């Protein structure tokens, strides 16, 4: 097993009393964690579960593949530039404790709304670059299990996915549940997908889907952020001002941005912080874009690890 196990534990939430920046929840010691929003009075952060939260791996698997497969890499970049559509099959797995909405029984209308958010975000309809990906819902499974609904540990995650996972590396499995440890969501990177097998996929708190109860984080962008990780994107702030997201056209950012701090500039040179990027930690209404460089990386990661 490679030492670089990148579980993108999206959206670990820092429980705080206000919507201002502050201390973040303690991160797990094994693996790194994608820090996301708080489910208390306000949320902070939105992140990745990588080996280290603040330091992306120095050896990029996507770049390694690009060096070895130049022609395929060029074709992947061309797809991104043309917005040529690759359709990703999606399975939604609803984990609920009972038949009520409060018990996690997310209605089909909210799942369809989440699918629309994903398609709008990745096709550039919200104002960013078109990534060349679209998503097509294949089906919805519903599982009533009180123990699984409170998804608090890795053992449950494995059991759930072993029972419910559908398709291969090219299939996006999205699981909804009530996450513990102040989490909004998590995912595995494309470059780890083959190694982790059925664990591959995206998990989000059911209240983050459009129409959920998480206030400024209930427009569906938690899933967008985590699917970005599923395509092997890192946070815009990974590596700080040195840049560690392996994308040239995202401005350097010293630390995660919260809320929507317009004009924030934490690094000298390179422009203002990319607070509107889906791979930062800002609130849903603030983020609306991927960059062309991120689109190219996603296409290359797809060709390398999922196609």
Show the residue positions of the predicted features.
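Extracytoplasmic/secreted envelope proteins and their assembly/folding machinery
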Residues: 112-115, 119, 201, 221-224, ...
């Amino acid at each position: 097993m490679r030492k670089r196990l990148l579980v993108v534990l999206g959206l670990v939430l820092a429980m705080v009393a206000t919507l201002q920046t502050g201390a973040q929840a303690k991160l797990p010691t094994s693996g790194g964690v994608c820090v996301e929003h708080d489910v208390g009075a306000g949320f902070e952060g939105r992140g990745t579960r990588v080996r280290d939260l603040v330091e992306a791996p120095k050896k990029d698997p996507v770049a390694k593949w690009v060096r070895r497969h130049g022609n395929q890499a060029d074709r992947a970049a061309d797809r991104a530039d043309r917005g040529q559509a690759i359709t990703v099959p999606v399975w939604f797995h609803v984990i609920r404790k009972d038949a009520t909405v409060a018990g996690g029984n997310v209605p089909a209308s909210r799942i369809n709304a989440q699918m629309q958010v994903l398609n709008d975000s990745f096709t550039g309809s919200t104002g960013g670059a078109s990534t060349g990906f679209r998503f097509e819902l294949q089906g919805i499974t519903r599982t009533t299990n009180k123990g699984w609904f409170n998804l608090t540990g890795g053992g449950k995650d494995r059991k759930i996915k072993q029972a419910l996972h559908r398709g291969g590396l090219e299939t996006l499995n999205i699981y909804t549940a009530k996450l513990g440890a102040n989490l909004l969501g998590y995912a595995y990177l494309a470059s780890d997908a083959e190694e982790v097998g059925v664990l591959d996929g995206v998990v989000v708190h059911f209240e983050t889907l459009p129409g959920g109860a998480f206030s400024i984080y209930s427009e569906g962008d938690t899933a967008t952020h985590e699917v970005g990780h599923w395509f092997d994107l890192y946070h815009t702030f990974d590596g700080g001002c040195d840049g560690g997201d392996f994308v040239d056209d995202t401005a350097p950012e010293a630390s995660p941005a919260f809320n929507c701090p317009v004009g924030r500039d934490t690094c000298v040179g390179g422009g203002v912080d990319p607070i509107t990027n889906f791979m930062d930690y800002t609130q849903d209404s603030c983020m609306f874009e991927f960059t062309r460089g991120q689109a190219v990386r996603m296409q290359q990661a797809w060709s390398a690890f999922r196609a």
